[in-house]
């Protein structure tokens, strides 16, 4: 079974599909848990690319609608050209954000996250999105799902320079992307390379100064929907 690639949205709103993802060798039952007959995914991820629109506000309402999926923490990262502004904290969406905070987050691309902890403790250091720097600039990642090879992935990305600030597998995926970019790959190639190291069920959104990436695991276990504004 061939995994689906990320859907890549550039700043002109053009979609592009890619090939070549590695599927997990684990049975589907191991990816979805002991009760594959019921929905067990947690966390909410949201992303929006909209020129000349208040994307922070759009992300806020998107997270508000997804809040049933996670109520421990909330966060939004907004890109304004080559700059990224991140705000995240413990609590409900309405407790973490108000109009004053949102007004300080101009831009045309935003990703957001509601957290329900499945790996890592319920602390602010584990709130998302995760933001890291690369040679191509900053990127932000929001993740729903679980990796069944998190221990192996941590060993793979622990190159002696990675400064881990959380206990989540989401940060491990982000470091895998960062290191792939810093090896000389562009964003789509780096994401493909990083996901070859990941086994599990997941949906991801990744924001960069060059575009928005939406990724779903090859089995389609974790929900992810996209559309046009």
Q: What residue spans do the PLM features occupy?
A:
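Methionine residue identity
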Residues: 1-3
């Amino acid at each position: 079974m061939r995994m689906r690639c990320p859907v890549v949205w550039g700043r002109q709103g053009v979609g592009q599909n890619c090939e070549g993802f590695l599927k997990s060798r684990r049975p589907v039952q191991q990816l979805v848990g002991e009760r594959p007959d019921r929905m067990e995914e947690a966390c909410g991820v949201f992303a929006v690319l909209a020129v000349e629109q208040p994307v922070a506000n759009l992300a806020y309402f998107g997270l508000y609608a997804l809040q049933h999926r996670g109520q421990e923490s909330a966060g939004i990262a907004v890109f304004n050209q080559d700059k990224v502004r991140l705000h995240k904290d413990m609590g409900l969406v309405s407790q973490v954000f108000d109009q004053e905070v949102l007004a300080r987050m101009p831009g045309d691309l935003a990703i957001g996250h509601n957290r329900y902890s499945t790996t890592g403790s319920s602390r602010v250091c584990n709130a998302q999105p995760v933001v890291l720097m690369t040679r191509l600039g900053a990127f932000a990642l929001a993740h729903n799902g679980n990796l069944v090879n998190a221990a192996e992935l941590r060993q793979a990305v622990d190159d002696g320079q990675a400064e881990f600030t959380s206990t989540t597998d989401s940060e491990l995926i982000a470091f895998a992307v960062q290191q792939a970019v810093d090896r000389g790959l562009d964003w789509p190639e780096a994401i493909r390379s990083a996901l070859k190291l990941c086994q599990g069920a997941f949906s991801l959104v990744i924001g960069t100064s060059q575009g928005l990436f939406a990724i779903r695991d090859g089995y389609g276990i974790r929900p992810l929907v996209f559309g046009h504004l």
